[in-house]
Amino acid sequence: MFYSIVAIFVGAGLGALLRWFLSLALNEFFPAVPLGTLAANLIGGYVIGIAAVVFTTRVGLPPEWRLFVITGFLGGLTTFSTYSVEVMTHAVQGEFGWAFAVAALHLTGSFALTALGMWTARAWLAAA
């Protein structure tokens, strides 16, 4: 149990720091679509795709790695709540086009990158 807690704790901290750095570096460039939040969710989509394949095909990996990557790192990196408030802020201000655009970018981008991550992992594993 101790190693599971440490894996989640360290992963979440690293994921949250990366999300914060992405926001600092990217959000100022296009305020209508905060690119830091978008980047965090798209990176998370790609990594979860890889992780889903790796952790289902490499069953011998210690469970702490899954907790570190998925529960910890990706839990700290990706953000549904920030995405939600960014979409709703546009909607409340009557900017329905922007609200739809932000929602569509996050959803379609995350699904596409999750699929790409799964494809990437399968290709890597097949080549190994």
Swiss-Prot record:
Record's catalysed reaction(s): fluoride(in) = fluoride(out)
Keyword field: Cell inner membrane, Cell membrane, Ion channel, Ion transport, Membrane, Metal-binding, Sodium, Transmembrane, Transmembrane helix, Transport
Gene Ontology molecular function: fluoride channel activity; metal ion binding
Location relative to the cell: Cell inner membrane
Activity regulation, short description: Na(+) is not transported, but it plays an essential structural role and its presence is essential for fluoride channel function.
Presence of keyword Ion transport: yes
Chain residues that bind Na(+): G75, T78
Main localization (coarse): membrane
Free-text function comment from the UniProt entry: Fluoride-specific ion channel. Important for reducing fluoride concentration in the cell, thus reducing its toxicity.
Pfam assignment, any one: CRCB
HAMAP family attached to this UniProt entry: FluC
Keyword Transport: yes
Stretches that traverse the bilayer: 5-25, 35-55, 67-87, 96-116
GO cellular component: plasma membrane
Family: Belongs to the fluoride channel Fluc/FEX (TC 1.A.43) family.
Membrane topology: Multi-pass membrane protein
Identification of the protein by name: Fluoride-specific ion channel FluC
InterPro entries: FluC
Gene Ontology biological process terms, A to Z: cellular detoxification of fluoride
